[in-house]
Amino acid sequence: MLFRSRQIVKDQDQIIEHIADALQRNDLILVLHNLPAGNWDGGERGVACLPGRENEFQEGVGHAIDYATALRCPQVNCLVGLAPKEASGDQVRRTLVANLRFAAKELKSAGIRLLVEPVNSIEIPGFYLDRVEKAVSILDEVGSDNLYLQYDLYHQQRMGGELLATYRRFKDRIAHIQVADNPGRNEPGTGEINYSFLFEALDRESYKGWIGCEYKPSAATSAVLGWASSHLRKEGKATREQGAGR
């Protein structure tokens, strides 16, 4: 079993030197990390849509650029946050659009791609971008050529399914895919999602990005990697990645 890359969720809890050393020792590359997401332990899941937190967001972008540059990470994901009840919908949207324009421009200057991720609002009530269609409307309004979707198949399944149809509809906007099965958010093969069908379809669609394994292993990590054996490409072709769960 061979994984060639990693993704990590919270950069602020990691020391760059330690991560760089671990990547080198294990012959891995880092392909994605998240922007700072506010007070995670306090329930925040991003600050990009929070009016009044713009300075914090911009500082986080600078921090993410330093972090990604040092670790040669080509893309950064933005969790946009929970819509604050005290703000109007228009205010929340304007704040998010302005912040994403800022981040996309700054990251582009550093040669780093910006992603946003729709997250299901069943498990995280109030998450502002809970559907792919809404996220794409934000991308359109931002109008940047450096802003893409992170398409999490588990979140899409929770919010309505149509996994392949949704991919095909928005594939030009999708730069990164994540997997987990439903119910339980465990490894592929433990639930209702037909990943053999989906992986074959993604190959037919010539998907070129990474696929992050953002799931909760149902047993020890190494004990449940068998699902990937038939899906990993042979040497010389793209391989899937293993990532941390949110």
Where are these regions (language model features)?
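Active-site-proximal flexible loops/turns
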Residues: Q14, D41, P84, I124, ...
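Histidine-acidic metal/acid-base catalytic patches
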Residues: R72-C73, L129-Y151, H155-R246
